[in-house]
UniProtKB/Swiss-Prot annotation:
Keyword check for Lipid biosynthesis: no
Keyword field: Cytokinin biosynthesis, Plasmid, Transferase
Inducers of expression: During the interaction with host plants.
Family per similarity comment: Belongs to the isopentenyl transferase family.
InterPro entries to which the protein is assigned, alphabetical: P-loop_NTPase, Tzs
Full protein name: Adenylate dimethylallyltransferase
First and last residue of the signal peptide: none
Reaction it catalyzes: dimethylallyl diphosphate + AMP = N(6)-(dimethylallyl)adenosine 5'-phosphate + diphosphate
GO molecular function: AMP dimethylallyltransferase activity
Broadest EC class assigned to this enzyme: transferase
Function: Transfers dimethylallyl groups to AMP as part of the biosynthesis of cytokinin phytohormones.
Keyword Nuclease assigned: no
Length: 255
């Protein structure tokens, strides 16, 4: 994400009086919400609550981007649940109830808490009930940078997921392990990024397990990364359209 955009986001919150309540950073996938939330939380010694359902799955750490969140000393990042693919889709209403309970628990103790997220289902529910929430809330919508830069950024993000983290785990191994469970194929295929890989597997008549065990050629890596990057951009543009329609122009909305 461009440094100037991050500085603008920080400045917007600097103009808001910091007191017990929720300070939300919302926006499209892959634009640096986690980094900005970390920066804000550290500057105020506040916890971060992640308003995201897919990041709750311990067997999708790379796929969801959770594995790449910086482990910053002194930072407390809280997820809404600790689930596995076998449990299936995390019901949006259940997830939202959990989100409000977690946020309320911090505010009731007199704490300020940073909320970060791009989950359309959770952020829309948050917006629809914002006037009735049991705590004050401030929302900052982070904008997508220029579209061409965003696509290149998401392709690079996809490459990172395909290559994996320091443990050797990557998006392909997570997909292969989840796919053999057999009972959650529809849910798995609904996850952005995984849907692109499954389409590639179907086109080339290979299973996710076979693909995960291959040494990817540059050509295949480029093809998968471009497909996934395009999917992330498509999803990100939809997120931004919905969030701007809901909260208004990029910037801070207070309640």
């Amino acid at each position: 994400m461009k440094e100037s955009t991050m500085a603008q986001t920080q400045a917007r919150f600097d103009r808001v009086r910091w007191e017990p309540g929720v300070y939300a950073i919302v926006g499209a996938t892959g634009i640096g919400k986690s980094a900005e939330a970390s920066k804000l939380a550290l500057s105020h010694s506040a916890p971060i609550v992640v308003a995201d359902r897919i990041q709750c799955y311990s067997d999708l750490l790379v796929t969801s981007g959770r594995a790449f969140d910086a482990k910053v000393e002194g930072l407390n990042r809280v997820w809404l649940d600790n689930r596995t693919i076998h449990q299936g889709n995390f019901d949006p209403d259940e997830a939202f109830d959990r989100l409000i309970k977690v946020l309320t628990s911090y505010v009731d103790r007199g704490e300020a808490v940073v909320m970060e997220g791009g989950s359309i289902s959770l952020i829309l529910r948050f917006a629809q009930t914002i006037s009735n929430l049991p705590f004050p809330a401030v929302v900052n919508v982070m904008p997508i940078p220029d579209r061409q830069h965003y696509f290149a950024q998401q392709c690079a993000r996809a490459r990172q997921m395909l290559r994996g983290d320091s443990t050797g785990r990557n998006l392909l191994t997570e997909l292969a392990e989840a796919w053999v469970l057999g009972d959650q194929h529809n849910f798995i295929a609904s996850v952005a990024g995984l849907d692109c890989v499954l389409d590639w597997c179907a086109t080339h008549s290979v299973t996710p397990e076979e693909l995960a065990n291959r040494d990817l050629t540059t050509e295949v890596l480029d093809e998968l990364a471009a497909s996934m990057g395009g999917r992330y951009v498509e999803h990100g543009v939809l997120q931004q359209e919905i969030f701007l329609r809901t909260f208004g122009a990029p910037g801070v909305t207070a309640r």
